[in-house]
């Protein structure tokens, strides 16, 4: 009966709490207290005779990802904008980006006065389609941004070959993929640069934060200037009380720096990232099997993937089932059963209510530019289909145990069984 669904007044399948997020590493309280009493709360504060947490985290995160350079930044959005500007992207340049992602994947490109060219995605991985990228390249294309979405890695073999063939920088947006590997190499280290977000929901978090990693020393130096008002860190420690930032005048920038509190948290959280990722992978593999028995299709990843990172567990509803029920209603029904948010996939960026360039006067740069950035010009059938039929769970649910995965599968089974009642 319809009443069996919790969203329709029935009894919820689960009332037990789920794992909390964030989960602070053991050393976080002491590290934050150390910053609090240090007299230096940011890299622009006076040098106190000891290495900043920002430098410590940058060195640790670079080593973790197998690259020589990491520049921390204020957010994932800031990191992507810094990488774009370090590539020389600017007014009128076209930047190819997947149409299925968080809205910032498009707005960051607008933010450097460039033109986002939204491309369709692979129907199974939900990541950028190499075929769509090849078809979208024009004489105005200046870069490709690839997003490793939810828990999948894009086809970096094909995308790297396309970028190399056309002489284009390739930027990896790894905001949802900290620690994932492709052919044994950490994501972010496979392209010109990799950008990361450390926002509250991410698997590596300091509330807000970001980073750019690269193998290119000159690129890293440009990013460093761009994020610190045109300044870079001194090559040698300054005298105590002096500023560690040097005014070189090489490249004008803005303030997109990370605070010492955030850097201290990240340095500690990095020490537990691999263990948490392994827990998520094991639970996701178990859940894949349970949901597969119900005819559901968990998101897959590209063939070159060595290890996945589960920021979000995404699953497609079975074909021919609940096709007349809005995915938002299915998500609400699952949420009611589990007491844990189950959300629809991202909307395609051009259709996202948050992506409205016309509401910002800074983007009114002439009729031609306004035409080029008009979201209505893009047709993205695979993105649209994925948004209609995909639901997602935040990675905190994957920090539980096998019983928790069983509850998730049972909730899906219940909603699939009684979901027709959602139409009334």
UniProtKB/Swiss-Prot annotation:
Q: Which InterPro entries match?
A: DegT/StrS_aminotransferase, PyrdxlP-dep_Trfase, PyrdxlP-dep_Trfase_major, PyrdxlP-dep_Trfase_small
What is this enzyme's catalytic activity, as reactions? Answer: 2-deoxy-L-scyllo-inosose + L-glutamine = 2-deoxy-scyllo-inosamine + 2-oxoglutaramate; 3-amino-2,3-dideoxy-scyllo-inosose + L-glutamine = 2-deoxystreptamine + 2-oxoglutaramate
Which key words tag this protein in UniProt?
A: Aminotransferase, Antibiotic biosynthesis, Pyridoxal phosphate, Transferase
Enzyme class name: transferase
Q: Report the pathway entry.
A: Metabolic intermediate biosynthesis; 2-deoxystreptamine biosynthesis; 2-deoxystreptamine from D-glucose 6-phosphate: step 2/4; Metabolic intermediate biosynthesis; 2-deoxystreptamine biosynthesis; 2-deoxystreptamine from D-glucose 6-phosphate: step 4/4; Antibiotic biosynthesis; ribostamycin biosynthesis
Q: What's a single GO BP term from this record?
A: polysaccharide biosynthetic process
Chain positions found as N6-(pyridoxal phosphate)lysine: 202
Q: Which cofactor does it need?
A: pyridoxal 5'-phosphate
Q: Which domain of life is it from?
A: Bacteria
Enzyme Commission number(s): 2.6.1.100, 2.6.1.101
Q: GO molecular-function annotation terms?
A: pyridoxal phosphate binding; transaminase activity
The record's section on Pfam families has: DegT_DnrJ_EryC1
Role of this protein: Catalyzes the PLP-dependent transamination of 2-deoxy-scyllo-inosose (2-DOI) to form 2-deoxy-scyllo-inosamine (2-DOIA) using L-glutamine as the amino donor. Also catalyzes the transamination of 3-amino-2,3-dideoxy-scyllo-inosose (keto-2-DOIA) into 2-deoxystreptamine (2-DOS).
Protein family membership: Belongs to the DegT/DnrJ/EryC1 family. L-glutamine:2-deoxy-scyllo-inosose/scyllo-inosose aminotransferase subfamily.
State the name under which the record lists this protein: L-glutamine:2-deoxy-scyllo-inosose aminotransferase
């Amino acid at each position: 009966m319809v009443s069996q669904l919790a969203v329709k007044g029935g009894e919820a399948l689960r009332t037990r709490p789920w794992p909390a997020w964030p989960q602070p590493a053991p050393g976080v309280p002491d590290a934050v207290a150390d910053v609090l009493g240090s007299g230096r709360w940011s890299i622009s504060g006076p040098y106190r005779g000891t290495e900043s947490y920002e430098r410590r985290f940058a060195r640790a995160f670079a080593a973790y990802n197998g690259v020589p350079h990491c520049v921390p930044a204020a957010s994932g959005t800031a990191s992507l904008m810094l990488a774009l500007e370090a590539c020389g992207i600017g007014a009128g340049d076209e930047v190819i980006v997947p149409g299925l992602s968080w809205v910032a994947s498009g707005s960051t490109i607008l933010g450097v006065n460039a033109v986002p060219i939204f491309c369709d995605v692979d129907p199974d991985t939900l990541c950028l389609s190499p075929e769509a990228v090849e078809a979208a390249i024009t004489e105005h294309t200046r870069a490709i941004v690839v997003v490793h979405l939810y828990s999948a890695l894009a086809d970096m073999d094909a995308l790297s070959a396309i970028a190399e063939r056309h002489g284009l920088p390739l930027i990896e947006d790894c905001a949802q993929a900290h620690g994932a590997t492709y052919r044994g190499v950490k994501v972010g280290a496979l392209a010109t640069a990799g950008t990361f977000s450390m926002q509250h929901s991410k698997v590596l978090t300091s509330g807000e934060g970001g980073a750019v990693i690269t193998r290119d020393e000159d690129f890293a130096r440009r990013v460093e200037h761009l994020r610190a008002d045109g300044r870079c860190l001194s090559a040698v420690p300054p005298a105590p009380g002096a500023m560690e930032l040097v005014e070189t005048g090489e490249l004008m920038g803005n303030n997109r720096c990370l605070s010492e509190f955030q850097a201290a948290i990240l340095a500690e959280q990095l020490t537990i990232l691999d263990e948490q990722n392994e827990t998520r992978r094991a639970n996701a593999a178990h859940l894949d099997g349970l949901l597969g028995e119900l005819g559901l299709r968990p998101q897959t990843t590209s063939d070159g993937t060595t290890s996945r990172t589960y920021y979000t567990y995404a699953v497609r509803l079975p074909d021919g089932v609940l096709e007349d029920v809005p995915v938002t209603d299915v998500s609400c029904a699952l949420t009611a059963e589990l007491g844990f948010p189950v959300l629809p996939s991202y909307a395609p960026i051009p259709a996202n209510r948050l992506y409205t360039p016309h509401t910002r006067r800074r983007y009114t740069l002439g009729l031609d530019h306004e035409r080029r950035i008009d979201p209505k010009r893009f047709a993205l059938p695979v993105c649209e289909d994925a948004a209609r039929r995909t639901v997602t769970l935040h990675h905190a649910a994957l920090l539980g145990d096998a019983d928790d995965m069983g509850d998730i599968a049972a909730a899906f089974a219940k909603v699939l069984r009684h979901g027709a009642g959602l139409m009334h």
